[in-house]
Amino acid sequence: MKANGGREEKEVFAAYIAKNRLKRSGQREVILDTFLRQQRHLSVDDLHQLVQKRRPDIGRTTVYRTLKLLQAAGLAQELALDGQSRFEREYKRAHHDHFICKSCGEILEFSNPEIERIQDEIAAGIGFVIEGHRHQIFGLCRRCAARPPRDEARR
C-alpha cells in the first residue's frame, strides 16, 4: 500500500460520492479502508469476510455495491477469473497482466514491455487501434506445479 495510507484514494472516493450526490456512510468508509489495505485480488466474499472482522453489521450486498462504486470512481478494477469476479486496486497503477493458477487460484501480476511492444506492432500491422487490454495466462503456479499429480500421489 502507498505510504499515505490510501489518503488520495479516499479523497477521490469522497469527491465521487459528493459529485453523484450519494450518501457518505461509515460502512462505505470501512469497506474502502479494508479494500485499500489489501495487496491481493479480492472476491466480494473475501472482502466481506475481512470487513466483518471490523463491522459485523455490514452485509455482503453493501460490500458488493461499494465495490461497484469504487469501480465507477476509478479506484478498483473488476477481473473475471475462472467464472468469479475479483477486484484489485486500480488508481494510478501501472498496466500489468496476470498469471492465474488453475489449481489453487493464486494470481501473480507481471509487466513486460516486450509483450506490450509486440502487441502494439501486431495491432499497427492490421490497422487496429488498441484502447486497452487484459492479458491473462492460465497454468500452474510454482507450488502447484511441484506437487505430484493426484494419480501418482495415491500410489
Give residue ranges: language-model regions.
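Short capping segments at the starts of secondary-structure elements
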Residues: 26, 37-43
